[in-house]
């Protein structure tokens, strides 16, 4: 399972959708990047393959970051989206 996490402007919580296959996840990642590079805001409608009832519509100019990562079985629930992890002080 692959997760695409979108960070939106003025929102501290990322929006996530999942894809079962690496190729599908990479294709979605590229389409989001192309929408972000565009000169005009476009409406993106995303669906989730993990939760088929989950649908998200957002404007491309409101996306500030996109992260594609692989979720593996046991680690999937405990991982926080993003690039950095903090370690508790001992």
Swiss-Prot record:
This is UPF0367 protein SYNPCC7002_A0153. NCBIfam families: PRK13683.1. It comes from the Bacteria. InterPro entries: UPF0367. It comes from Picosynechococcus sp. (strain ATCC 27264 / PCC 7002 / PR-6). Belongs to the UPF0367 family.
